Amino acid sequence: MAGGAAEAAAAVVEVGSSGQFEELLRLRAKSLLVVHFWAPWAPQCAQMNDVMAELAKEHQQVSFVKLEAEAVPEVSEKYEISSVPTFLFFKNSQKIDRLDGAHAPELTKKVQRHASSGSFSPSGSEHPKEDLSLRLKKLTHAAPCMLFMKGTPQEPRCGFSKQMVEILNKHNIQFSSFDIFSDEEVRQGLKTYSSWPTYPQLYVSGELIGGLDIIKELEASKELDTICPKAPKLEERLKVLTNKASVMLFMKGNKQEAKCGFSRQILEILNSTGIEYETFDILEDEEVRQGLKAYSNWPTYPQLYVKGELVGGLDIVKELKENGELLPILKGEN
């Protein structure tokens, strides 16, 4: 065990100076270089160091680096590191991607993607640019109203993004968002794609409306409400969600990963019936989580619906199964 731990630790290089970092960029130019900007006082950084050590075992062709953000401020400032943990990805000494926050599955995905994507050349063929342009077009059209921002609507990571979210919410505007910190290629590419150098950026039907100043002007002139689509009232939204599939389960987590014991048990029961069903993760939408309690007058989760009607929670589903009534109800026969 001790030997394995030492081997894993050795696979992650610790950098203590700007000079050492620049030298490492030069020496490891041919491979993917993943740099973890961390701090010893942040427990989530320790967890991500463990994740990185495991990834280093799996991807021996990738170079993994730990850099204490506050100990090497010149590097942190150069790459706009404002919080820890933050991960930067380099190829050919060029930064190609970024991940802010302790997101182990996302880190694993990015390492796998970039490690398998072959050599990256900033001055390469035109095809990657065409691919990026197509990707940006899809992203800007991903929803009728798309906000490209720093962070998420729940956790904006700059004052301008926070103000933008507040304005959109105040006007009950329905929008989806993209965290530009999660994808460096999109962050840089969108500036050129739309000839707009700053964030946040708001798009309607794929067309750039503008940044915060423009949105404030549109709000002042009363035009904002006519340009952006309105969010449906919560009750309408809950009605649509509960009818999204014939059998709908509102739970903590999803089919692949239940995040509480009650949700896990109800998944096992539903899976044993062979009936198709869909799930909604209430942990990802606080409005739905709270609203559904009042909508159905049922204070706890999970909640099971058939054709938009509440069947009940885990205890009721267990009773129905024991009585042999569950399958007919799920099939809509009762």
Curated annotation (Swiss-Prot):
SUPFAM superfamilies: Thioredoxin-like. Residues 145-235, 236-334 form the Glutaredoxin domain. Residues 2-116 form the Thioredoxin domain. One of its GO terms (biological process) is regulation of the force of heart contraction. The modification Phosphoserine is found at S116, S119. [2Fe-2S] cluster binds at C158, C260. The modification N-acetylalanine is found at A2. Residues 116-125 have a biased composition (Low complexity). GO terms for molecular function: iron-sulfur cluster binding; metal ion binding. One of its GO terms (cellular component) is cytosol. Residues 110-131 are annotated as: Disordered. The keyword ATP-binding does not apply. It is found in: Cytoplasm, Cytosol; Cytoplasm, Cell cortex; Cytoplasm, Myofibril, Sarcomere, Z line. InterPro entries: Glutaredoxin, GRX_PICOT-like, Monothiol_GRX-rel, Thioredoxin-like_sf, Thioredoxin_domain. Keywords: Acetylation, Cytoplasm, Iron, Iron-sulfur, Metal-binding, Phosphoprotein, Repeat. It comes from the Eukaryota. PROSITE patterns: GLUTAREDOXIN_2 (PS51354), THIOREDOXIN_2 (PS51352). The thioredoxin domain lacks the two redox-active cysteines. This strongly suggests that it lacks thioredoxin activity. Homodimer; the homodimer is independent of 2Fe-2S clusters. Heterotrimer; forms a heterotrimeric complex composed by two BOLA2 molecules and one GLRX3 molecule; linked by [2Fe-2S] clusters. Interacts (via N-terminus) with PRKCQ/PKC-theta. Interacts (via C-terminus) with CSRP3. Interacts with CSRP2. Together with BOLA2, acts as a cytosolic iron-sulfur (Fe-S) cluster assembly factor that facilitates [2Fe-2S] cluster insertion into a subset of cytosolic proteins. Acts as a critical negative regulator of cardiac hypertrophy and a positive inotropic regulator. Required for hemoglobin maturation. Does not possess any thyoredoxin activity since it lacks the conserved motif that is essential for catalytic activity. This is Glutaredoxin-3. It comes from Bos taurus (Bovine). The gene is GLRX3.
